Amino acid sequence: MSNVLFIKANNRAIEQSVSVKMYHEFLESFKASHPEDQITELDLFAENLPYYDGTAINGMFKTGKGLEATPEEQAAAANVSKYLEQFLAADKIVLAFPLWNMTVPAVLHTYIDYLNQAGKTFKYTPQGVVGLVTGKKVVILNARGGNYSEGPMAAAEMAVNFVMGNLRQWGVQDIETLIIEGHNQFPDEAEMIVQNGLELVKKAAAGF
């Protein structure tokens, strides 16, 4: 039995959002094909994550070093650690998010800030950063209305690249990326683009 963490970073209605459609398509297909696995759903917008600020940084540093922290710092560190330990405990992780304004929703950035902890997800060495998160499988579900896979917009894509860069820094190697794109750029083909993409999502979930 695997512990599987489903992370959704979009609070739009399913009728309005392709990345939310992808999330639910993957979730339902995975449930049907992996009835023995333990699934945890994490809706980042519903969590109302505080920004990773000076209080949280000081709290994580002090508690990690066994130093005295203020009550506010202790509370902030406990909140960060809750999400960090949940992530580390998962065997498989599903991340669903849109490309908004060429990057990720702010709540996902905050969540990734929580996870970027030296000594937990990576460590510093004289040769550079070394990832500490190994043995996990991750699938990225991303939707973007324009075409960012090629052409002049490819260099502007800072959503999937941002998430992938962090995962790789943490040592995660087994990453599958499923992207639906161009449905706003090519409205006459939108229905076909989305449906074809969702079929791939469904199949990928069965084999995840």
Language-model region placement:
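N-terminal beta1-alpha1-beta2 submodule of the flavodoxin-like/Rossmannoid cofactor-binding fold
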Residues: 1-97, 102-113, 117, 199-208
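A short helix->loop->beta-strand "cap" motif at the edges of active sites that frequently abuts
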Residues: 2, 35, 135-136, 172
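Cofactor-binding loop segments of dinucleotide-utilizing enzymes, especially the Rossmann-like FAD-
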Residues: 9, 143, 180
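Short histidine/acidic/glycine/proline-rich micro-motifs that form metal-
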Residues: 11-14, 146-147, 184-185
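Glycine-rich phosphate/pyrophosphate-binding loop and the adjoining helix
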Residues: 28, 150-208
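Amphipathic coiled-coil/heptad-repeat helices and related helical stalk/stem segments
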Residues: 79-80, 125, 159, 197
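Substrate-gripping "pore-loop 1 plus following alpha2 helix"
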Residues: 118-124
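Short, glycine-/small-residue-rich phosphate/pyrophosphate-handling segment
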Residues: 124-169
